[in-house]
Amino acid sequence: MLPATLGLRQNLRQFILLVIVNAFVGGMIGLERSILPLIAEQEFHLAATSAVLSFIVVFGIVKAITNYFTGTLANRFGRRKLLITGWIIAIPVPFLLMSADQWTWIVVANILLGLNQGLAWSATVVMKIDLVGERQRGFAMGLNEFAGYLAVALVAFLTGYIASHYGIRPYPFYI
């Protein structure tokens, strides 16, 4: 077996794929940030501030705990398996958000989303660093964050636009 070749140019295809995957991870957050406060107020009659705090706090705690274990899990089971597991966990999230008839289901969706983010986002970070090596680690991290947060902004804008024209459920979730 040949030794792995490090560097962005040498691994550009895999790197671009991981940037795209990370953008999808960020897109899930963008969808939530624009739509859930509206759902909280209009459908569940919750104050937007309370609602935002409840789902963001739950998401943040779960993501932080998952991040803590992700490095060890990645070394034990492999980065690819972690990334796939993170996405499998995320599959029900849009469906839960689209059909939730109680705020509890929104919170449950955010627990799953926190697990997804902790596994998938973190796995893409580690995988990118593995591909480019230590010398280009900062650049890899910068692209990772740029792609993720650009997707947050674009999807938040797009879902907000869709919600303002077609309603807050279900159309924004089809993205």
Labelled PLM ranges:
Residues R9-G60:
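Helix-loop boundary and gating motifs at the non-cytosolic
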Residues L18, T104-N110:
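Short hydrophobic/alpha-helical segments at membrane-entry points of transmembrane helices
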Residues G60-Y68, A153:
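Residue-level signature of mid-helix packing/kink "hotspots" within the transmembrane helices
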Residues T66-G78, A163:
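Helix-to-loop junctions at the C-terminal end of transmembrane segments
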Residues I88-D101:
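C-terminal ends and interior cores of transmembrane alpha-helices
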Residues I111-G148:
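Cytoplasmic helix-loop-helix junction between adjacent transmembrane helices
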Residues S164-I175:
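A membrane-interface helix-boundary motif in multi-pass transporters
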